Amino acid sequence: GSGAVKELAKQTAELLNGRKAECEVYPTQIAFNVLPHIDKFLDNGYTKEEMKMNWETVKIFGDEDIKVSATCVRVPVFYGHSEAIQIETSAHISENEARELLRSANGVTIMDERRDGGYPTAVLEATGEDSVFVGRIRQDLSLSNGLSLWVVSDNLRKGAALNSVQIAEELIKNHIN
């Protein structure tokens, strides 16, 4: 929320001016740091935000067999959500097929060039945009029917967990039976 954004700005200014960062909203310094903790911890060791990704996926697809394992990380940017996503499908789908399916999906912009800067970032591409940006589309080396994707969006316009599910939904609807 706005209190967290204000704390990030304040801590950034304090640290750049050689002062110690004061923590009020976060349990530890957020400026120039990464926190593997969003929302409260549950008994199973996951946070509520991580379990919401699981619950929402099962709910949207209506399939209790879908498995999601997420680690949600707070990264100190003022706006934007970013996700590294691994998808395992029941049938093989090539990265080119996935790229074309996603390119045809409403609200998805593909930015996937294999060069420095050929991928989307939350701050530069997604801020102020309604579209979800997808890049770094590639075969997952650990799964024979797996894909890895990099996804960014403006969290003030679209929620991150929902968009991950929407992308997976597009792949399933258009390719996987």
Enumerate the predicted regions with their spans.
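C-terminal active-site/capping subdomain that shapes the small-molecule cofactor and substrate pocket
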Residues: 65-177
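Active-site-lining helix/loop region of Rossmann-like oxidoreductase modules
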Residues: 1-101
